[in-house]
């Protein structure tokens, strides 16, 4: 019987949805959305990040004034408890993803280790 990796991937997706880390992100994001100021700061910061990524992908330089604006936004975000909670939750989930990725690529690592 052949192993269907996609079935395992779907099980992993469900396990991630059931995890405490996922629930923490979901709860923290709900708090951000409920608070008008937090939501505005969060949306502006994400918009700035996407703009930077787009410019970098196109090989454009990011103007100094845009960098300054992003730094000011980052400082405001650090002071916002709701967004800080969300960022901490995202960081924990990112750690989980890194650990899962190490497990997933382990068979390939073993092949190339010799």
Curated annotation (Swiss-Prot):
Domain of life: Bacteria
Classification via Pfam families: Com_YlbF (PF06133)
Entry's family note: Belongs to the UPF0342 family.
Protein name (database record): UPF0342 protein SERP1381
Organism, scientific name: Staphylococcus epidermidis (strain ATCC 35984 / DSM 28319 / BCRC 17069 / CCUG 31568 / BM 3577 / RP62A)
